[in-house]
Amino acid sequence: MFIISSKNMLLKAQRLGYAVPAFNIHNLETMQVVVETAAELRSPLILAGTPGTYSYAGTGNVVAIARDLAKIWDLPLAVHLDHHEDLADITRKVQAGIRSVMIDGSHSPFEENVALVKSVVELSHRYDASVEAELGRLGGVEDDLGVDAKDALYTNPEQGREFVARTGIDSLAVVIGTAHGLYAAEPKLGFAALPPISERVDVPLVLHGASKLPDSDIRRAISLGVCKVNVATELKIAFSDALKHYFEENPDANEPRHYMKPAKAAMKDVVRKVIHVCGCEGQL
């Protein structure tokens, strides 16, 4: 097996009415757990990393580990650039073997966003890499960068149609009230915004900020056209909480192979639950 584009993966999800989970990876253990669980459940999978993740782990290391895991588990993997903004950085990573890109120009005016995204599409498609872009502005914190809720903007359906047509993107990240990070109160998603977008846009839709959303909200979003669901913070919390608990019980512990076991088990529970909610088990 090998590293693939996420394009056909998402088109199949769109056709059959489920969603592909994109789990943000942070270290070797995250990658091991996510891939192993997806393989056991025969689920399609996207491994996503922010610029901070690739800086921490090294793009070459991420690609090499993903290729090895794909071979071990006989699982095609999409390794994805999440919320990247710089064309030169994206170019280097695509040339290193990445085949799925999210270019985020959502903080820019519409015309600037279109121009940036179009340039990334032209570059990425030469390498058979798929491109996702965001229209609207998501609240919350990602990679230590924050957007206040008051500054978040929903995706405009008519602009969405124009954006997809002019840029040639393969999937569209929509903003309907989700946010990066965990929610201080139960979010109220704008589900009514999804049908007008789906009617005007023929590419798969992406939902960011799905950590700790009620399962019913995720399922409803999928029923209205969402084909990719991003989960990041929920994995980090499970991992870190399990580590904290282990050291509370074993304050003198110093063997990573021991204390990583409960941390990986906690993440595995999250991955299994998300795959079930997305309805993608057995869809390889």
From Swiss-Prot:
Binds 1 zinc ion per subunit. Its cofactor is Zn(2+). Keywords: Galactitol metabolism, Lyase, Metal-binding, Zinc. One of its GO terms (molecular function) is zinc ion binding. The active site is at residue 82. Its EC number is 4.1.2.40. It comes from the Bacteria. Induction: By galactitol. One of its GO terms (cellular component) is cytosol. GO terms for biological process: D-tagatose 6-phosphate catabolic process; galactitol catabolic process. Zn(2+) binds at residues 83, 180, 208. NCBIfam families: cbbA, PRK09195.1, PRK12737.1, tag_bisphos_ald. Forms a complex with GatZ. Catalytic subunit of the tagatose-1,6-bisphosphate aldolase GatYZ, which catalyzes the reversible aldol condensation of dihydroxyacetone phosphate (DHAP or glycerone-phosphate) with glyceraldehyde 3-phosphate (G3P) to produce tagatose 1,6-bisphosphate (TBP). Requires GatZ subunit for full activity and stability. Is involved in the catabolism of galactitol and D-tagatose. This is D-tagatose-1,6-bisphosphate aldolase subunit GatY. The gene is gatY.
